[in-house]
Amino acid sequence: MSDFNTLRWLHGQPQGQGRLKVSPTDFQVVEDLGFAPDGDGEHLLVRIRKTGCNTRAVADALAKFLGIAAREVSFAGQKDKYAVTEQWLCARLPGKEMPAMRAFTLEGCEVLEFARHRRKLRLGALKGNRFSLVLRDITHRDEIEQRLSLISEKGVPNYFGPQRFGRGGSNIYQAKRWAQTGQPPRERNKRGFALSAARSLMFNTLVSERLQRFGVNQVMDGDALQLAGRGSWFVTTPEELTDLQARVDSGELLITAALPGSGDWGTQRAALAFEQATLADETELLTLLTREKVEAARRAMLLFPRELRWQWQDDATLEVSFWLPAGSFATSVIRELFNTADDVSDISE
């Protein structure tokens, strides 16, 4: 099964080199929930800017400040520690007065705003993230300029980034050990990380193999197609292939790949046969996902960064910004620009 660094590129392997995070200010992320606080309710939403802090540590510090259990503070997603990030935390405070949030202090953190809300903020309940990056020590400027234009027009493979798999692939190691021995990781969150990593790696393998053999825009009989920007999908039939191919070429529809698990994968006929053959050697992980009742799903094979903008500070330093939907990875965009020796396994999605 493919390592992230050996997955196929949509625009060919880059020739250039570059560095992704020389300092925290080079990697800035602003969370986009997609909704505003209600203004009333038993929950408190707090928007925080943090540098050099991981999300869980900030949540625990907020719980301590508010005098509540750590489990009463939630967030929509983990954000990178070695970066400047803005995100919302949610604290359940039924029947309590509005706390003096400006008095909350934690090194590297700043409270930006806060308001009451009616519902708990759950993991994954965000629209997306806006990234502002400074890329340094870049070579092959002309090639990277061309690649930025290609990415803007044609997107990138929607790979799960290496951070999904843990440092040194630790989450995948846990999943394979679990599959082989039947012994799950002791901690609940590590079990979740292992299962997520297993099917994410298989998704990456499907996309890379499809890209190599057919291209990610070639519609097959039985493909599961998704309306761009939507989560629902439908299955192609032989009679519709010509019309659906035109809609894929125009960007109206996206071809999906399986997030394997229990139940129907969604594809049929030729597309299903391709997915099954590609993952034929992964019976242990597939059995694990089925046994643990991880429901199969679909994910678009292509990712289109929105509002992609860039500006050169000098010939070797590039500022680039873009918006990605929840669950997408900035590292999967950057890998289409240049090669990097930086360890990006700790960059949160």
Swiss-Prot record:
Pfam families for this protein: TruD (PF01142)
Record's keyword annotation contains Lyase: no
GO CC annotation: cytosol
Residue stretches spanning the membrane: none
Binding residues annotated for substrate, in chain numbering: 27, 129, 329
Domain TRUD stretches: 155-303
Broadest EC class assigned to this enzyme: isomerase
Name of the protein this chain belongs to: tRNA pseudouridine synthase D
Gene name linked to the record: truD
Residue numbers annotated as active site: 80 (nucleophile)
HAMAP family for this protein: TruD
Enzyme Commission number(s): 5.4.99.27
UniProt keyword annotations, A-Z: Isomerase, tRNA processing
Any GO BP: tRNA pseudouridine synthesis
General function of this protein: Responsible for synthesis of pseudouridine from uracil-13 in transfer RNAs.
Catalysed reactions listed for this entry: uridine(13) in tRNA = pseudouridine(13) in tRNA
